[in-house]
Design a protein with these regions (language model features):
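Periplasmic-binding protein-like
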Residues: 1-18, 161-164
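Extracytoplasmic small-molecule ligand-binding "clamshell" domains
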Residues: 4, 13, 27-99, 182-183
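A short, compositionally biased domain-edge/stem linker segment
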Residues: 19-28
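Bilobed "Venus flytrap"/periplasmic-binding protein-like clamshell domains
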Residues: 41-44, 54-67, 117-186, 205-207
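Acidic, polar ligand-binding/catalytic clefts
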Residues: 63, 67, 72-144
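Alpha-to-beta junction loops
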Residues: 70-72, 88-97, 150-152, 185, ...
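A ligand-binding cleft/hinge motif common to bilobed small-molecule-binding domains
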Residues: 81-85, 97-108, 163-167, 171, ...
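Short beta-strand->loop
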Residues: 110-117, 121, 179-181, 212-219
């Protein structure tokens, strides 16, 4: 995929000047030769839906893989926490959902070589000045670590941001005193931030930028 330029083209479609390509899922049919992909289509620009079609980096890659294998593509959209488990239970063939490689997940699946290095982003209200003086990630972390138990931080359930707040020995996160409030997707977390349901939101950088841009354009 990398050697023939397909991966770069897919990245350009979703991160650059290209156009995201619609990916259709066939209906599951055990009589056919199908590639069944588990995902959680709540994570733009990696996997998301518009109407009945799937879009995003992982979904375009899934379509390419199915075509190379000569199989019909079936996409099963499920809760994020069930994605790896569904492969481990042989209900799906592969999982593609913006997954962070972790030892816990290796109990269920074998990972490919990593193809994207993600980072986390903190989303705050425009009127919040708590982090205005921060000049580095260490400055941000120092404030996050000083937050007390009464503070609430929104995140997408089961993601790296969730693990960062609650703590994870596997990923090397000591955790915060602030309470993690997990949502089905990052957009719901940010909406609750606007509605004063949480104080901050921590999610992956790519979806954070898309969500913040969309919210600001609506304001």
């Amino acid at each position: 995929m990398k050697s023939d330029g397909t991966f770069d083209a897919i990245c350009n479609n979703n991160f650059g000047s290209g156009t995201p390509q619609a990916v259709k899922s066939a209906v599951l049919d055990k009589s056919k030769d199908q590639l069944i992909v588990a995902t959680n289509a709540e994570f733009e620009p990696f996997e998301y839906m518009k109407g009945e079609n799937y879009y995003g980096v992982d979904m375009e890659m899934a379509a390419y893989i199915a075509k190379k294998l000569g199989k019909e593509l079936v996409i099963k959209n499920m809760n994020f926490d069930a994605v790896c488990l569904s492969v481990g239970q042989h209900k799906c063939d592969i999982a593609m959902a913006g997954l962070t490689i972790s030892e816990d997940r290796k109990e269920y699946v074998n990972f490919s070589d990593p193809y994207y290095e993600a980072s986390q982003r903190l989303i705050v209200k425009g009127t919040d000045t708590t982090f205005d003086a921060c000049k580095s990630a260490d400055d941000v972390n120092a404030i996050l670590n000083s937050l007390t138990e009464d503070k609430k931080i929104g995140c997408q359930q089961g993601t790296t941001g969730n693990s960062f707040i609650e703590g994870s020995n596997d990923l090397g996160f000591p955790g915060l005193k602030a309470k993690a409030v997990a949502y089905k997707n990052g957009s719901l977390a940010v909406q609750d931030l606007i509605n004063n349901g949480v104080d901050y939101v921590i999610i992956d950088a790519a979806p954070a930028e898309r969500i913040a841009k969309a919210i600001n354009e609506m304001s």
